[in-house]
Amino acid sequence: MTETNSYSYDESDNNNSLEELPEEKLVEMVEENSDMNLIEAAMQELSYKDKSYALKKGIEFLVNNAFDPYFQSCIFDSIYKLDRETVLDCILSRETDIDLYFFKDILTTMIVYTPYEDFINIKNYKIYLSFLLMHYKRYDENEKNEMIDLIKEFKKNFHLNTPFKASL
């Protein structure tokens, strides 16, 4: 028996796929655990089984800047496809800066899960682009060079032949 915070689970839980666990047990894993890897895995599964909970809890993790940039990226990836606008609005409302790792993941996730046609139909898409540009400008030259190919792909995917292009 392994104990992590107040949630206890058998080693057999680790041997079983999370897909086999009931929603209630997955929620319990998220609510009562401090192991970010276990929480992330449970959240990924909940994004299929209980979308409403996953979105609500994922937003909470992102707003509170929970754990580290890797965890935030995993949570973002899990919930972005559930409700793009709500998740992007959450990112806009964050009071903390976005770590480079997380920023690159946001761009990558948007490229993968948001066709251009869908993106331009999002009500606040110009605000999201401005927000991303603002954060991009905060990175130093080495960090910008680290993501040069990603920025090119992002601009191509979202047809950014506007002032955004000159800034990126």
Predicted regions and their residues:
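Amphipathic alpha-helical scaffolding segments comprising HEAT/armadillo-like alpha-solenoid repeats
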Residues: S17-V30, K51-V63, R84-E95, Y116-L133, ...
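Structural detector for internal amphipathic alpha-helices that build alpha-solenoid repeat scaffolds
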Residues: T2-L18, E28-E31, N37-K51, E60, ...
